[in-house]
Each structure stands twice: as structure tokens, then as C-alpha cells.
Amino acid sequence: MIQFEHVTKSYEKATILKDLNFTIPDGQFVILIGPSGCGKTTTMKLINRLLEPDSGIISINGQDIRLQDKVELRRHIGYVIQQIGLFPNMTVAQNISVVPKLLKYDKTRCAKIVQEMLKLVHMEDY
């Protein structure tokens, strides 16, 4: 579960997020939609601590992310960016397996994850 409690973030004199509150339950897929400059990217960067909030608390599974190691936190969070973030010289399956391999999962577990992800988007037969 990801939770934002009274989160505010400003850049110089512009407040981008003001008193933001929301909860994303485990297993929930979320899409942030809005015009340029409304805070979508800022929100995502706050979740993985590429940015720090000016105030408020962001927690994952009840733990304040400020208390977590940034690198370890990022290893367990994934999101899809607007621009293409794939390796063009790799297959879809190879792209999917990048993170599990970085986490040092064995080949069997990597293959299982790849198949689960392909099935999720109805591409398991490709």
C-alpha cells in the first residue's frame, strides 16, 4: 500500500503539490493523468525518493519511506514512464527480465515473472 498524507512539494516559488492525500491499495494499478505541469512526474519522483517532500509523509506498507534506504526502496518500485524506456536491442521478454536479473533471481523465477507479465497484457503467445 502506498499512502500520501498531507504531502506538499514546491519548486522555488511554485507549489506543485499542496496537501496531497491518497492511498493506493496493494495490487492496484494506478494511472496519473493530467496536463503538463500538474505534478504527475513530481508525485512519481516522490514515491521513489528522487525528490523529497517539503512536508507530509509518504509511506509504503505503513513504513515512512524517509526511513528506508533509497537504493533498496527503488529496487521494489516500478512504474512506466511517458517516454520509451525499453532497450531497443532486446526482445520484450528480455526487457521484462532486466529487473528480476538485477535482483539476482534465478533463471526459473525470471522466466516465470516474464510469463506472468506477458499474460497480464495478453501477450503470452508472442
Show which residues each predicted segment covers.
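Conserved ABC transporter NBD signature motif
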Residues: 56-64, 73, 113
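ABC ATPase NBD coupling module
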Residues: 64-78, 102-107
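Short coil-to-helix segment of the ABC ATPase nucleotide-binding domain corresponding to the Q-loop/switch region
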Residues: 90-97
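Helix-to-loop junction immediately C-terminal to a conserved catalytic motif
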Residues: 48
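ABC ATPase nucleotide-binding domain signature
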Residues: 81-85, 90
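The feature captures the beta-strand-to-loop junction immediately N-terminal to the Walker
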Residues: 33-35
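Conserved ABC ATPase "signature" region
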Residues: 97, 101, 108-126
